[in-house]
């Protein structure tokens, strides 16, 4: 797929949204769908829960990067934003004839594996307890969400599969690792699932620029961390994502 000229980003006021906006602005026309205005960006102000209010944001858009999500403690927030809101974004994209949606899923969809060895040893940086030749978790393995947020992200992946199959949209689900404001891990678990700022931007841009015939994919996005247990080979083969950074613990 040649680089799209018109990209809509939901959740641009968040950390990843801001990083992606700054990178894309030099080569694309970028629009935000956000509840609050974004300085210097064409912003359609609307709530994702209002399907009647969001369609103007999708006019003339090639690619949607859906980053908006609720991460708090209120279950109703997860249901309204991460389930209903995600459905509304996908449906508005379909109705507008958008070519591709890049859906920000989460590595938390597989974080339940951290309760088991050797993954627990990896996220605790118990290097002597990690067996040689261990196989990473891949996107072919069963999901193991570690909470309601993760479960809603798994729902988004399933819905993306349906929109690819039933409506012909190109849907790429990116299981994003831990992106931190300070861009450095603060504990061994963060070091295992860390995704640097520049690797996060690279992963999203690789999804945007992936071949046009890529109909559906679920991909992990983490940096090249010593404690990494999530597969990166599939992302390398599918979109050419090769992390430039990595974390160790102790740092």
Task: Indicate where each model-derived feature is located.
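Alpha-helical substrate-binding/gating segment
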Residues: 165, 175-183, 194-216, 224
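NAD(P)H-binding glycine-rich loop region in Rossmannoid oxidoreductase-like domains
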Residues: 45-84, 92
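Conserved beta-loop-beta element that borders a ligand/cofactor-binding pocket
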Residues: 147, 157-182
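N-terminal Rossmann-fold cofactor-binding loop
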Residues: 32-37, 48
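Glycine-rich NAD(P)-binding loop of the Rossmann-fold in SDR/ketoreductase-type enzymes
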Residues: 49, 77-88, 96, 151-154, ...
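Conserved Rossmann-fold NAD(P)-dependent oxidoreductase catalytic core, especially the SDR/UDP-sugar
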Residues: 88-146
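Conserved C-terminal active-site "lid" loop/helix of NAD(P)H-dependent oxidoreductases
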Residues: 216-242
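N-terminal Rossmann NAD(P)H-binding glycine-rich loop of SDR-like oxidoreductase domains
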Residues: 4-27
């Amino acid at each position: 797929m040649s680089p799209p000229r018109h990209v809509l980003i939901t959740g641009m006021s968040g950390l990843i949204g801001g990083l992606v906006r700054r990178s894309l602005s030099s080569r694309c026309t970028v629009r935000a769908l956000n509840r609050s205005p974004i300085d210097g960006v064409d912003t359609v102000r609307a709530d994702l829960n209002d399907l009647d209010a969001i369609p103007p944001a999708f006019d003339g858009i090639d690619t949607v990067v859906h980053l908006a999500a609720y991460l708090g403690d209120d279950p109703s927030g997860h249901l309204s934003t991460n389930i209903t809101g995600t459905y509304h974004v996908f449906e508005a994209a379909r109705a507008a004839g958008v070519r591709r949606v890049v859906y920000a899923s989460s590595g938390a969809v597989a974080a339940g594996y951290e309760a088991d060895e050797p993954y627990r040893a990896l996220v605790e940086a118990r290097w002597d307890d990690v067996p040689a030749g261990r196989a990473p978790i891949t996107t072919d393995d069963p999901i193991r969400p570690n909470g309601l947020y993760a479960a809603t992200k798994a729902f988004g992946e399933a819905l993306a599969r349906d929109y690819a199959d039933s409506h012909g949209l190109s849907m790429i689900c990116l299981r994003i690792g831990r992106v931190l404001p300070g861009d450095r891990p603060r504990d061994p678990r963060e070091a295992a699932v860390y995704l640097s700022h520049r690797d996060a931007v690279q992963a999203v841009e690789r999804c945007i620029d992936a071949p046009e015939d890529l109909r559906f994919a679920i991909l992990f996005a983490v940096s090249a961390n010593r404690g990494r247990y999530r597969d990166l080979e599939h992302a390398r083969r599918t979109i050419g994502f090769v992390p430039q950074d990595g974390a160790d613990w102790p740092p």
